[in-house]
Amino acid sequence: MHDSFSDAATPVVSAFYDRFPYPGDPLQDGPPPGYNWRWCLRSVEAAVHGQVRPKENGQRPSRLLDAGCGTGVSTDYLCHLNPGAEVLAVDISAGALEVARERLRRSGGAGQVASLRQEQRSLLDLAGEGPFDYINSVGVLHHLRDPLAGLQALAGLLADDGLLHLFLYADGGRWEIHRCQRALELLAVGNGAEGLRLGRELFEVLPETNRLRRHHAQRWALDTVAEANFADMYLHPQETSYNLTGLMALIEAAGLHFAGFSNPSVWDPARLLEGELLERARSLAPREQWALVEELDPDISHFEFFVSRQPVHPESWTEDSRLLEAAGEVQPCLW
């Protein structure tokens, strides 16, 4: 691994993921299950811009970066859903990368792309590797001591017309997780095997009527069956979460532009309101609508979204002449 630990938390976070390679998804032989459009560049372009760039003969391969790839789940999809691309996947954990390499070997992902590099490196130490057409960094920046420095580093690797997909923790929907994290920290259980044992025991000994126990059973029990997933949720040594205002401030501080949520239906007030209340909500500016949803839905535990270096102006297709000139393309998710 490159020895430049650019973030103060890198050594402890790397050691944590060596103990608990994350995510704990099982390996499979053959392509990954289902279809995740967020990891298909052409689907992402269609969602963000309302159109895709025409394919041209001799066009260079798309360049993709999986920044903080963990055990390779996202890398696997990126390879299978972007055939012919050049893919660089990096992570600070040797243990997680060992699993990732085996995952891609078994799935045949490397054979789908022009090139695949899986390297033990920090996303802060990739100067000279860009530009990338698409950067995927899911669940990574909030584990840096300085998330802004991480976002600025990724911004510097992004092509002028590229897109960056991020997943960051949302403060409001993680209240029960935060309480459990603080309780386990007060109990000094650590973030190793003992912490895992005592963390699971906590949810067994709390009264059945306890809200923390009930919320864990209702929301997180299935997600944390794998040991690595439980540890990542409750024992992580470095974590930051955001509200909507703080998220937008982070994006702007990095010199980037918000380009839309990758789960837009979650942020639609119609999911929560109707009648006159919905009409009033619809009259608000988009950010105010999102702020309203944030206040009304205390279960939103993360933000998933796209950012760009330049402002995005999606094609609305309201002009008949533009629509008649367009050529259709079969959505890749139909395979």
Model-identified regions with their sequence ranges:
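Class I SAM-dependent methyltransferase SAM/SAH-binding core
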Residues: 63-65, 75-124
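A short SAM/SAH-binding and catalytic strip from SAM-dependent methyltransferases
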Residues: 133-146
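Conserved class I S-adenosyl-L-methionine
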Residues: 60-70, 163-213
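A short acidic, Gly/Pro-enriched loop at the edge of an enzyme's catalytic core
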Residues: 124-134
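Rossmann-like AdoMet/SAM-dependent catalytic core
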Residues: 214-335
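A short glycine-rich, Lys/Arg-flanked "PGG" loop and its adjoining helix->strand segment in the class I
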Residues: 148-160
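Conserved alpha-helix/loop element of class I SAM-dependent methyltransferases that forms part
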Residues: 29-61
